[in-house]
Design a protein with these regions (language model features):
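Hydrophobic, proline/glycine-rich low-complexity stretches
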Residues: 1-102
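HotDog/MaoC-like acyl-thioester-processing domains
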Residues: 1-14, 86-147
């Protein structure tokens, strides 16, 4: 893949997003999953993985690519392959996230790696997300994205 060196230059790129842990997304997911959870109040801890309810992208329709994701070349590198999939990941919980927490997620592109598979070129991008509240690091997560 001739553009690999240019794509590797995206390693180390970061972006930060701030959010507020509110109860509405928790109530909505509880209802969707038909759970009988008590209404979350200030200080209620998020169950594991429910941090995915926050830091949602807000792209204008004109900024969305044909694959339904944000057009390439924003935070993620402009990989010239047709499909993007989540290939795996790792999660570490350091401290609970709670309703009322002001939080910040800092995302970093850790690596961009080319491989050749049965169907041709593959590009793997590993993105690390660190989520902090006022007390410090709460969640560390890595996403393996394959193109």
């Amino acid at each position: 893949m001739e553009k690999l060196s240019a794509l590797r230059s995206w390693q180390g790129r970061t972006e930060s997003i701030e959010d507020l842990i509110t109860s509405a997304p928790m109530r909505a997911l509880s209802a969707t999953l038909d759970r009988n959870d008590a209404d979350p109040t200030h200080g209620t801890e998020l169950p594991p993985l429910w941090h995915w309810l926050y830091f949602l992208p807000h792209h204008a329709q004109s900024e969305i690519g044909v694959d339904g994701h944000a057009k390439r070349g924003g935070f993620l590198p402009p990989v010239p392959l047709p499909r993007r999939m989540w290939a795996g990941g790792r999660l570490h919980w350091h401290a609970p996230l709670k309703v009322g927490d002001a939080v910040k997620r800092t995302s970093t592109i850790l690596s961009v790696t080319h491989k050749t598979g049965r169907t041709g070129d593959l590009l793997f991008v590993v993105v690390k997300h660190d989520i902090h509240n006022a007390s410090g690091l709460c969640v560390s997560e890595e996403h393996d994205i394959v193109y």
